[in-house]
């Protein structure tokens, strides 16, 4: 499968989205998936995939009460505990990274058994990190130490 990370920082005509479109323009996919979140759906459409299969398992980590807040603005006492154990503890009462990786692994298991061999996936950094763990590229503890650029194309083979 090909996991394509999205960013809407510069809009769809910006360099990141255009780079993704260019990077996959010569690829042939037998199936296309997207996170249902709008920035991934918009990027998929910009790249010519107007009806990707939307799958909730491709969503970014659920940060619970911390969702859409700046880190500097958080005063939640759980934040310090989460920093110390971000793999196992739920972020803001939402989801733990370990649970996110489980749902991504379930998606990838289903994809591997689907018969599709060339998939394009429009998703988020955390999902890509979980996919790297699944593919054996790195242990879960190191999954965010590998650089994944905004707008990059990431190819994973299983």
Label every PLM stretch briefly.
Residues 1-50:
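Active-site-proximal alpha-helix that buttresses catalytic centers in soluble enzyme cores
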Residues 18-22, 101, 105-113:
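Generic structural signal for well-ordered alpha-helical scaffold segments
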Residues 34-35, 102, 122-123:
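Short beta-strand scaffold positions
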Residues 47-103:
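Phosphate-handling substructures
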